[in-house]
Amino acid sequence: MAITNNAHREITQLAPEDSFLVFDRIKSEFDFPIHFHPEYELNFIHNGKGVRRVVGDSLQEIDDLELVLVGPNLVHGWELHQCKNTNIHEITIQFHNDLFDDKLLSRRIFKPIKDMFNRSNHGEDLPVFGQL
């Protein structure tokens, strides 16, 4: 697909000694190119109705609230598309794929989290708190 062929390889600011990074932004547009990186990325978007989410081969218009977990090296990005809002709130958390080691994830109580990480290889759209 053309999206994958034109994806930008992002070099994140996440250093080996960091556990995670958090970016909290108010924006009027999405100007970062479609990209991929080896880290996990959890994205929360508020006031984004009409924004188009690109994850892998999937293109979807989002609602006012968006929470998605993107797995390592999965092509992703957001485009303004039909969104008219100029006050979009975006919180991004990037973390290494070894932050939660196999021993921890193999514990029974972590099975739902391990399953969520496995599904994130395709982009895991998470329910947003009952749509607040």
Across the structure, where does each feature detected by a protein language model lie?
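A hydrophobic/aromatic-rich effector-binding and dimerization subdomain
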Residues: 2-14, 74-132
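Generic protein-terminus/edge-of-domain signal
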Residues: 1-67, 73-74
